Amino acid sequence: MSRTIFCTFLQREADGQDFQLYPGELGKRIYNEISKEAWAQWQHKQTMLINEKKLSMMNPEHRKLLEQEMVQFLFEGKDVHIEGYTPPEKQ
């Protein structure tokens, strides 16, 4: 049975995560406030960031940058800016 939460990203009720996907206090916040749908949107943006900026998850500075982008995207309403990328609907 899935959990329903109020997703702060989508601003509506949605299916919550099945388990905590990220460590620490931030992970608890994501588990309690971010839906599966919003997390999937973040994963798409995260993949683009890693690829376009050539980030390495072995590099602590790159992981910190990615975490900052994640917080801004999920909780502060700031879209991820990827230089040179234009979404298909805006071309």
Curated annotation (Swiss-Prot):
Pfam families: Iron_traffic
Record key words, sorted: Iron
Keyword Iron among UniProt keywords: yes
An example molecular function term from Gene Ontology annotations: iron ion binding
Domain of life of the source: Bacteria
UniProt-listed GO biological process terms: cellular response to oxidative stress
GO CC aspect terms: cytosol
KW Cytoplasm (keyword) present: no
Reported function: Could be a mediator in iron transactions between iron acquisition and iron-requiring processes, such as synthesis and/or repair of Fe-S clusters in biosynthetic enzymes.
Subunit description: Monomer.
Family recorded in the similarity comment: Belongs to the Fe(2+)-trafficking protein family.
Name by which UniProt lists this protein: Probable Fe(2+)-trafficking protein
Species of the source: Klebsiella pneumoniae subsp. pneumoniae (strain ATCC 700721 / MGH 78578)
